[in-house]
């Protein structure tokens, strides 16, 4: 996340996630001042969407006007689509094709080879 923020020359805020069990996650954010801004949440995997929805609600409560989420691997199981309605848009790579697929990892893999 900090690399992306550095490349884009934008501020970064890291939220801490602690997994209590297979279905329960506790998210802490500290002070979030995003009033009037566009926020982007980055995560490696979105499964049920619970963590992203919690983070998006924290950002909305902090005054973010728009909230986007992006991930590498989008599973989007159970009621994820409903939970993620708090976000303005969701972007996922093509590692798992789906309704939120917006970008390909193929160029990065080809470059690495």
Question: Across the structure, where does each feature detected by a protein language model lie?
Answer:
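PRPP-associated nucleotide enzymes
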Residues: 1-113
């Amino acid at each position: 996340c900090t690399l992306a923020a550095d490349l884009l020359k934008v501020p970064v805020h890291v939220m801490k996630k602690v997994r209590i069990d297979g279905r329960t996650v506790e998210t802490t954010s500290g002070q979030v001042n995003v009033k009037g801004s566009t926020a982007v949440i980055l995560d490696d995997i979105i499964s049920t969407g619970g963590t992203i929805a919690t983070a998006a609600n924290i950002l909305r409560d902090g005054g973010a006007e728009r909230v986007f989420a992006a991930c590498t691997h989008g599973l989007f199981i159970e009621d994820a689509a409903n939970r993620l309605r708090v976000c303005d848009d969701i972007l996922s790579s093509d590692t798992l094709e789906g309704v939120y697929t917006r970008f390909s990892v193929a160029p990065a893999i080809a470059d690495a080879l």
